[in-house]
């Protein structure tokens, strides 16, 4: 089973946040479409997407705060977040979800 551990912890700028991400493929393996696992526990953090993202919730509930509204997904449900969105990811308790991003090399497009 694919999982995450402390080596996959994401730096959100807040040391109390518990966010873990693990890419499933390298850019060499999948140069256009990125995919990975994300797990969060009792955390809310801001994020601006310069890529399109779909999140498939495996367990728990994922809330995305966007433009003053909250969209939520539970197990077996999918969220779509369009490129250019300034959001806040939020989880109460624990959630595990798969993310799919296009383009896969979004980090090289941030300008830094």
Model-identified regions with their sequence ranges:
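A short, N-terminal "cap"/entry segment at the start of jelly-roll beta-barrel domains
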Residues: 1-34
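Short, conserved beta-strand element in jelly-roll/cupin
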Residues: 39-42, 48-66
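Conserved strand-loop elements at the edges of beta-sheets that form or border functional pockets
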Residues: 49, 56, 75, 83, ...
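Short acidic-glycine-tyrosine-enriched beta hairpin
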Residues: 67-84
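Conserved hydrophobic/aromatic positions in well-ordered beta-strands
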Residues: 25, 34-38, 55, 98
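Ligand-binding loop in jelly-roll beta-barrel domains
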Residues: 83-107
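Short glycine/serine/proline-enriched coil/turn segments at secondary-structure junctions
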Residues: 29-30, 46-47, 89
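Short, charged, solvent-exposed linker or helix-capping segments at domain edges/interfaces
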Residues: 109-112
């Amino acid at each position: 089973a694919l999982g995450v551990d402390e080596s996959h912890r994401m730096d959100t700028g807040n040391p109390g946040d518990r966010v873990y991400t693990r890419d499933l493929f390298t850019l060499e393996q999948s140069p256009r479409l990125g995919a990975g696992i994300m797990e969060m526990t009792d955390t809310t953090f801001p994020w601006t997407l310069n890529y399109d993202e779909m999140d498939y919730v495996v367990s728990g509930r994922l809330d995305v705060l966007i433009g003053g509204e909250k969209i939520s997904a539970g197990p077996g449900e999918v969220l779509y977040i369009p490129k250019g969105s300034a959001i806040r990811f939020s989880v109460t308790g624990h959630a595990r979800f798969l993310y799919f991003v296009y383009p896969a090399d979004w980090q090289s497009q941030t300008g830094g």
